[in-house]
Amino acid sequence: MSAAGPIAAAVGRALGRRVTAARQVAGGDINEAWAVRLDDGEVAFLKTRADAAPGEFATEAAGLAWLAEAGARVPEVLAVHDEPPRFLALAWIDGGRLDAAGEVALGSELAALPAAGAPAFGAPPPGAPAGGLRLGALELPAATALDWPAFYAEHRLLALLPHAGQDAAGQRAVEAVAERMDELAGPPEPPARLHGDLWSGNVLAGADGRARLIDPAAHGGHREVDLAMLRLFGRPAARTLAAYAEARPLADGHEERVALWQLFPLLVHAALFGGSYRGAVTEAARRAAA
């Protein structure tokens, strides 16, 4: 992209300012990411993709607003452009490291999400365009329910299983978990407001020592799911977990359910990337059912 390119021109029109420079930056597996300098000196973060679906970036923006409404720190949405070239422009966050206060604040903010709630399991953020749950290049059909075990079994595990490249043993292991969800899911929980893709790479530490949540696939779900995914690709700080537990204690048996909730993101990764994730699905299913 150049400052004279069609995306730069669209960004300028959307923001009411002229783009004077742009450089490509790291920013995800499927999108192009750019640091865009505007004529007033402000820098914006721009994510774009030639084959982005209509409403895709608008849904992400709605998710960020939904999380912010509950008290989570997120980047400010500057503009959404839902016609080609499609893009999402966010306020630039200078990177840094979480300090001790930031680790505590993150735990408290994550605990505020279930307190804010959601209308139903699977419910999208208010104002999001119609469509299913998008995770990278994968989209699950839209569905909502008030029965969490049945929802997780049908619309998460079994919906993904045909796409996850499992052998016969892996398929049987996942199906066995789905059949036992009423038993395995633990005490009933009301629908929580979830980030929906909360791995460590989507927790951005700012130069102020505080975390911002980025790249959400926000929806209503079980509150333990976000925490389980945060533990899947890294280990959240002890201060973060302690602050969460102090603000909103977890139900008995939550440690035994971590593998159960990690099964969903592992199925997503198996569907998107294959390889070792296929075996990880089988292992998680067996641990969940143990």
Where are these regions (language model features)?
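Hydrophobic alpha-helical segments that form the core
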Residues: 259-267
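Conserved N-terminal boundary motif of the eukaryotic protein kinase catalytic domain
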Residues: 16-23
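Active-site Asp-x-Gly
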Residues: 141-153, 158, 162, 190-193, ...
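An alpha-helical support segment within catalytic cores of ATP-dependent transferases
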Residues: 3-13, 118-193, 206
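ATP/Mg2+ or Mg2+-diphosphate-binding catalytic cores
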Residues: 269-290
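Short, low-complexity, intrinsically disordered N-terminal peptides in bacterial proteins
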Residues: 1-16, 37-41, 289-290
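A short, local hydrophobic-aromatic micro-motif
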Residues: 20, 75-78, 214, 228
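ATP-binding pocket architecture of kinase catalytic cores
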Residues: 25-147
